[in-house]
Amino acid sequence: MAELRMEHIYKFYDQKEPAVDDFNLHIADKEFIVFVGPSGCGKSTTLRMVAGLEEISKGDFYIEGKRVNDVAPKDRDIAMVFQNYALYPHMTVYDNIAFGLKLRKMPKPEIKKRVEEAAKILGLEEYLHRKPKALSGGQRQRVALGRAIVRDAKVFLMDEPLSNLDAKLRVQMRAEIIKLHQRLQTTTIYVTHDQTEALTMATRIVVMKDGKIQQIGTPKDVYEFPENVFVGGFIGSPAMNFFKGKLTDGLIKIGSAALTVPEGKMKVLREKGYIGKEVIFGIRPEDIHDELIVVESYKNSSIKAKINVAELLGSEIMIYSQIDNQDFIARIDARLDIQSGDELTVAFDMNKGHFFDSETEVRIR
């Protein structure tokens, strides 16, 4: 178990712009932290600096209060799980899991005990004498996890470990990794580009873009209160809807539509000097409703929408529509038989909406 601190971490390669730019994060003991962001945002580079596989260009990294910038990877007491499993094809599952322990010249009885315990936790007991080619993708990933578990390290690092698996296996392995963390309580950093993995697995999420942290928070906080337009658009599937509009006192005008803004939000916008200015309004697809009782309650924030596309997804329908050429998606219940081309009255739950500065794209609060 370990507490980690990263203070003003930078990573420079040949380019002038840093690959990781002023990264600051405190990770408490037993946390499951997820770094999430698009390709090239610096999340894997940051993970590799934690592991000691990349040199920290500037800044300080601490494990349990000890600065470890110059400590070799093998001496950091960290176990890493990679995207490609990194298994030895000529070795059995048992030997793959035990390999790191044998290198450390651990006594055979202790190796046997640790491997068997890890195999039991991961459901690999009957596969210990098989070779990797005889295993499914999910089983191979379990072997890679087993190799990390037997190390009994202070910190687990996982670099997109599920990206090679199909969708069904990813869901299954997500649950297994969560259960594993609940059981072992090892401080974990997990890297992914998949926002669903971030939302379902993390104690806290670190959203990154262009080498910079955009937001740090619990999955609930990041989803419900995005720091900026990027976070709102990246976290959530479908993403948050965004509209450019102009604020008047009490209303936001989006083209020909005028939506009433709740007084609590209006007070903040008024105090910040946004009346008469263009802002960006954001709202989640599930906060746009078609139920009659909601439409009646929110008459002042309702519009008639022509349905361009209706996607049936079992118990819900994704409605694709527009307000004056600005696209939006609504997630509604599948109780109605809705078709493309139909017209539907929908209400925006303005209490759930957010306003962003049109220039900085930062949430106004």
Swiss-Prot record:
SUPFAM superfamilies from the UniProt entry: MOP-like (SSF50331), P-loop containing nucleoside triphosphate hydrolases (SSF52540)
Q: Where does ATP bind?
A: 37-44
Q: Does the keyword Glycoprotein apply?
A: no
Where is it localised?
Cell membrane
Q: Which domain of life is it from?
A: Bacteria
Q: Which Gene3D superfamilies match?
A: 2.40.50.100, Nucleic acid-binding proteins, P-loop containing nucleotide triphosphate hydrolases
The entry's keywords: ATP-binding, Cell membrane, Hydrolase, Membrane, Nucleotide-binding, Polysaccharide transport, Sugar transport, Translocase, Transport
Q: Name one GO molecular function term.
A: ATP binding
Which top EC class is given?
translocase
- Please indicate if the UniProt record lists ATP-binding as a keyword: yes
Topology versus the membrane:
Peripheral membrane protein
GO BP terms: polysaccharide transport
Induction per UniProt is: Expressed in the presence of either arabinose or arabinotriose. Repressed by glucose.
- EC nos: 7.5.2.-
Supply the SMART domains for this chain.
AAA
Annotated ABC transporter domain residues? 4-235
User: What is seen without this gene?
Assistant: Deletion of the gene abolishes induction of the melREDCA operon the presence of melibiose and raffinose. It does not affect growth in the presence of glucose and arabinose, but it has a negative effect on the ability of the mutant to grow on the alpha-1,5-arabinose oligomers alpha-1,5-arabinobiose, alpha-1,5-arabinotriose and alpha-1,5-arabinotetraose. Deletion mutant cannot utilize pectin and galactan, and shows a slower but steady growth rate in the presence of type I rhamnogalacturonan or polygalacturonan.
For this record, the Gene Ontology CC terms, alphabetical, are: ATP-binding cassette (ABC) transporter complex, substrate-binding subunit-containing
| NCBIfam families per UniProt | PRK11650.1
Q: What exactly does this protein do?
A: Required to energize different ABC-type saccharide transporters. Part of the MdxEFG-MsmX ABC transporter complex involved in maltodextrin import, of the AraNPQ-MsmX complex involved in arabinooligosaccharides import, of the GanPQS-MsmX complex involved in galactooligosaccharides import, and of the MelEDC-MsmX complex involved in melibiose, raffinose and stachyose import. Is probably also part of the ABC transporter complex YtcQP-YteP-MsmX involved in polygalacturonan and rhamnogalacturonan type I import during pectin degradation. Responsible for energy coupling to the transport system.
Assembly with partners or alone? The complex involved in maltodextrin import is composed of two ATP-binding proteins (MsmX), two transmembrane proteins (MdxF and MdxG) and a solute-binding protein (MdxE). The complex involved in arabinooligosaccharides uptake is composed of two ATP-binding proteins (MsmX), two transmembrane proteins (AraP and AraQ) and a solute-binding protein (AraN). The complex involved in galactooligosaccharides uptake is composed of two ATP-binding proteins (MsmX), two transmembrane proteins (GanP and GanQ) and a solute-binding protein (GanS).
Family recorded in the similarity comment: Belongs to the ABC transporter superfamily.
Q: What is the protein named?
A: Oligosaccharides import ATP-binding protein MsmX
